[in-house]
Each structure stands twice: as C-alpha cells, then as structure tokens.
C-alpha cells in the first residue's frame, strides 16, 4: 500500500516546486533592472505615449507608464535632437519599502515644461502586442501598421522608438536612464530621470494662496555631472 501512494506524492511535490519556481521568477523579473536596459517609447499616432523599460526584450517590463503627453508632441520634441523627460513622485513615509520604479503616479516634465501626470500600467495584451512586434529591433524608430480593429485603429498607427539605455542609480530616490548610441554620435539624445522628492506644505506670508509646495532634497548633482560628461 505505501508503494502505491509514493508516486502521487512525488508528483504533487514536483508540481508544487514547479509552481513555486514559476511564481518566484515571474515576480522577480517584474521589478529587476540592471545597468543596461531596453527602453521603448510607443503610442498611437493620435494617442498618448507609453514608456517601458525591460531587462531584455523577452522579459516583463519592470517599469511601464502612460504619459499624458500626446505621441505627436513627443515626436516633434525628438526632432529637436535633445529630449529630457523628468518623472517626479512624492516621498511618503508610509511607503518606505516601495521601490522607485514601482511608484504609481508621476508628475511629468519634458524639456522643462510641465506635461501633466504619468500613470503606472500593467502590461496587458495590447502593450505586449507592441513590445512583441518591436522585439527584434535593437535600436530604431518606426511605425506599426493599423490592425484594422475598430477599437484601437481609430487612434491611428502605432509609432515607436526603441534603444538600449544606461541606467544610473543615484539613490533609492533617484535614477537616470541615458539612451546609448552605438556609434557614439548622431541621432537624438534622450535622457529620462526618475525622482522621488520630499514635499512640504507651508503657510507663506507673501502669497495669496493657502499653501504652496516646496520641493526639497532633489538629487541633481549626479545628473548634472552626467550631463556635463555627455556634452564634453
């Protein structure tokens, strides 16, 4: 009798081990990024820009947000040759353990201009479809044709730009991503900054508003040094 129960127990044990490995690998790959990452900007021509960072083209995006910036506006900015996108979120004491790339809401600035808010997104079927289509592209920009679906086709073709980025971690509250040009010259320069900042509400005597927001402890030194190296 014990010999007949031994095989099913082994099968159950193997199944549990396999499920544990799958679960751990899926959750681990979701939030892990190295010093070299794959960055993709994409969006429907009449829609908004999505920004994704992946460890490699086949891994789940560790960072995926939808910006309020229209795709057409970002295309015009990229044509200028130099684009800096800053994403800022508030530092909250009740979320001490949250990783920077897991923050859900960001204030967005593009070349110093306010561009609304960016929202963290889960990678759904539509996002995976785009990332899968551009998977073979190591660096470049282009347009994906419309699928003919009435729900998504109404926003036009999908425009994308894909490249390798160097990831620089300043602290647990600051990271920077610099687009890497294989030849070292030519093409647009794109830098993306993630900043988690402390926000204080105070009562000023010299303004009519009830309060204003003062930003503190923004770690700029790392990024200014890096930009100086790029310009030299």
Task: Mark where each language-model region is.
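An exposed acidic His-Trp-rich patch
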Residues: 93-157
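Intrinsically disordered, low-complexity, charge-dense segments enriched in Lys/Arg
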Residues: 157-162, 189-190
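Broad hydrophobic/π-residue packing in well-ordered secondary structure
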Residues: 106-109, 119, 161-163, 176-181, ...
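Surface-exposed beta-strand edges and their flanking turn/coil or helix-capping segments
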Residues: 57, 64-68, 76-81, 98-99, ...
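Short, low-complexity, polar/charged sequence segments that are solvent-exposed and flexible
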Residues: 70-72, 83-86, 120, 127-128, ...
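N-terminal low-complexity/intrinsically disordered pre-sequences and tails
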Residues: 1-68, 167-232
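Short, well-structured hydrophobic secondary-structure segments
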Residues: 44-115
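Eukaryotic short linear interaction motifs
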Residues: 59-61, 73-75, 94, 115-118, ...
């Amino acid at each position: 009798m014990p010999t007949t129960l031994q095989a099913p127990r082994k099968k159950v044990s193997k199944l549990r081990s396999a499920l544990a490995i799958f679960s751990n690998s899926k959750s681990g790959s979701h939030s892990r990024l190295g010093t070299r990452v794959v960055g993709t900007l994409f969006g429907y021509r009449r829609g908004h820009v999505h920004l994704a960072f992946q460890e490699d083209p086949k891994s789940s995006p560790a960072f995926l947000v939808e910006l309020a910036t229209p795709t057409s506006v970002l295309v015009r900015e990229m044509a200028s040759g130099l684009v800096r996108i800053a994403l800022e979120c508030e530092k909250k004491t009740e979320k001490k353990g949250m990783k920077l790339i897991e923050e859900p809401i960001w204030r967005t600035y593009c070349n110093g201009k306010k561009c609304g808010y960016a929202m963290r997104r889960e990678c759904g079927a539509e996002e995976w479809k785009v990332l899968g289509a551009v998977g073979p592209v190591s660096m470049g920009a282009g347009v994906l044709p419309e699928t003919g679906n009435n729900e998504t086709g109404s926003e036009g073709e999908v425009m994308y730009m894909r490249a390798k980025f160097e990831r620089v971690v300043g602290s647990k509250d600051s990271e920077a991503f610099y687009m890497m040009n294989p030849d070292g010259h030519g093409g647009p320069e794109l830098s993306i900054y993630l900043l988690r900042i402390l926000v204080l509400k105070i009562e000023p005597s010299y303004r009519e508003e009830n309060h204003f927001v003062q930003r503190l402890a923004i770690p700029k030194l790392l990024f200014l040094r890096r930009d100086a190296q790029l310009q030299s």
